[in-house]
C-alpha cells in the first residue's frame, strides 16, 4: 500500500518549520527564565516556567509530527542562546507577555496563509496553535494584572512566587 501523500506548499512547509524553531526557542527562553528564577530564590515561579518550557516542546512536536505525517522531512532548527540577562521576576512576567503576543502574531500568519491557500488541514493545525495562544495570553496577562493591581514590593512578589508554584 502506498504512503499517504498530500501536497503542501513550500511556503507552508517553511512556516511549519519556522513554527518548530519558534516553539523550541520559546522552550529555551522559558528554561532560561526558570534557571534565573531558581537561582534568585523564586522556586515557585521556576517550577512554573519549567512547565512552560516543556509545553513549548510539545507544541514543536505537533509541527514535527504534522510534517512527518505528510511525508515531509521537518528541519531540526539550529538555535541561538536565549535571552538570559533578566533583572527581576517583574521583568520576566512582562517579557513573557510580550513574547506570547509575538507568538500569537506568528500563529495568526500561519492560519492566514493556510486559509489563503485553502489548505484546510494546515489551517486546522494553525487553529490548534491559536487555541493554545488564547490560553497562553490569558496566563501571561493574569500575572501582568497581578503586578499592576497589587504592586511589586517584596511581600507581593513572594506571594506571586508561591501562587506560581501552586499553578505549576
Which residues does each PLM region occupy?
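Iron-associated oxidoreductase/ferritin-like identity signal
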Residues: 1-168
Amino acid at each position: 500500500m502506498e504512503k499517504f501523500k498530500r501536497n503542501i506548499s513550500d511556503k507552508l512547509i517553511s512556516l511549519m518549520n519556522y513554527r518548530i524553531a519558534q516553539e523550541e526557542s520559546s522552550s529555551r527562553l522559558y528554561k532560561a527564565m526558570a534557571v534565573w528564577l531558581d537561582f534568585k530564590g523564586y522556586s515557585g515561579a521556576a517550577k512554573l516556567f519549567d512547565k512552560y518550557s516543556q509545553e513549548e516542546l510539545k507544541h514543536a512536536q505537533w509541527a514535527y509530527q504534522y510534517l512527518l505525517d505528510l511525508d515531509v522531512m521537518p528541519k531540526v532548527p539550529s538555535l541561538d542562546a536565549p535571552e538570559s540577562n533578566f533583572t527581576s521576576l517583574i521583568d520576566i512576567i512582562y517579557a513573557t507577555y510580550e513574547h506570547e503576543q509575538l507568538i500569537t502574531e506568528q500563529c495568526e500568519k500561519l492560519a492566514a496563509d493556510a486559509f489563503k491557500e485553502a489548505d484546510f488541514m494546515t489551517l486546522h493545525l494553525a487553529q490548534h496553535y491559536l487555541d493554545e495562544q488564547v490560553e497562553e495570553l490569558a496566563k501571561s496577562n493574569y500575572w501582568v494584572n497581578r503586578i499592576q493591581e497589587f504592586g511589586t514590593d517584596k511581600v507581593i512578589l513572594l506571594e506571586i512566587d508561591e501562587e506560581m508554584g501552586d499553578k505549576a
